[in-house]
Amino acid sequence: MTSFLTAARAEQEKLTPDTRRLRLFSGTSNPGLAREIAAYLGVPDGPRVCKRFADGELYVQIQESIRGCDVFLIQPTCAPVNDHLMELLIMVDACRRASARQITAVVPYYGYARADRKTAGRESITAKLTANLLVKSGVDRVLAMDLHSAQIQGYFDIPCDHIYGSPVLVDYLSTQNLDDIVVVSPDVGGVARARAFAKQMNDAPLAIIDKRRTGHNLAESLTVIGDVSGRTAILIDDMIDTGGTICAGARLLRQQGAKRVIACATHAVFSPPASERLSADGLFEQVVVTNSIPIQQERTFPQLQVLSVANMLGEAIWRIHEESSVSSMFR
């Protein structure tokens, strides 16, 4: 995708870590993405030690002075969710005790986001609990991408900048010579997301799959609301976990006469048996995701396309550091 920050602007702004006191540090959940963000900004991924003791306890040490610095900690809380969340909390505490001026948690994938409300008695709202933990640990700001529900921003008592992976997905799809596009929401809850995506796809028509969930990680697709016959169907969701929802939707779209089916999602959780389901012959022409979560080699398959969101995250970090608008990136 086109770089948000041109070389000319970088020169004009004199973007250097020494003069701007911008510091990046990554945990262990997605170091590859952190390196790409650091390269985009022209600052190093700072030195730190993250290790585990024999009893399972985590240890973090920041290995350079960050006193008075604007610190960004890059750590999606993907699997193993609890370890990566705890590591992030320890990193925040270490930076706070090292007298960082401001600490921003960059969480491209926000674990526990699906536990955003009670669906039965005596349940925890774990998305809110996670937000409380981040705030209490000493975070000043959170930068997240494609939260499962936008209302999670309100769980934080600190600023939360919410950005979207859709421009990266749309830029890629625009190069694929697609015709007769229809954007499909895999469930009623994703209609707002699908409608916004369809608008970016030159106001493509919208279809909805009516789905009834029968249990955790289980879903049953019932019917398609809208016309998909003879069209290229783009199934859009925020994440793909086990693949049950989106694969059931794809089968239904094929039955309804869709000539091509492409799956798009920001977050590739890919819990087993997602890869086997998604790679089934003839189901998807492509499965397009981003690198918000690292994908292990054994979970890749021929139809998979992984796009980088490093430039987008890097630009958002730069704008936060410069105290300029983040939302204007998406206007």
Curated annotation (Swiss-Prot):
InterPro entries: PRib_PP_synth_CS, Pribosyltran_N, PRibTrfase_dom, PRTase-like, Rib-P_diPkinase, Rib-P_diPkinase_bac. This is Ribose-phosphate pyrophosphokinase. One of its GO terms (biological process) is 5-phosphoribose 1-diphosphate biosynthetic process. It catalyses: D-ribose 5-phosphate + ATP = 5-phospho-alpha-D-ribose 1-diphosphate + AMP + H(+). Involved in the biosynthesis of the central metabolite phospho-alpha-D-ribosyl-1-pyrophosphate (PRPP) via the transfer of pyrophosphoryl group from ATP to 1-hydroxyl of ribose-5-phosphate (Rib-5-P). Mg(2+) 2 binds at D187. It holds the Pfam family Pribosyltran_N. The lineage of its organism: Bacteria, Bacillati, Cyanobacteriota, Cyanophyceae, Synechococcales. The active site is at K211.
